[in-house]
């Protein structure tokens, strides 16, 4: 997809593009 999920990991902001 074209779906992008943003999630906070500890103090690090990570993003996963699906």
UniProtKB/Swiss-Prot annotation:
Output a single Gene Ontology CC term carried by this record. Answer: pilus
Q: What is its main location?
A: other
**Localization in the cell:** Fimbrium
Keywords recorded for this protein, A-Z: Fimbrium
Q: What else is known?
A: This is an alpha-galactosyl-1,4-beta-galactosyl-specific adhesin.
**What is this protein's function?**
Fimbriae (also called pili), polar filaments radiating from the surface of the bacterium to a length of 0.5-1.5 micrometers and numbering 100-300 per cell, enable bacteria to colonize the epithelium of specific host organs.
Protein name per Swiss-Prot or TrEMBL: F7-1 fimbrial protein
């Amino acid at each position: 997809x074209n779906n992008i999920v943003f999630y906070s990991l500890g103090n690090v902001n990570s993003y996963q593009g699906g």
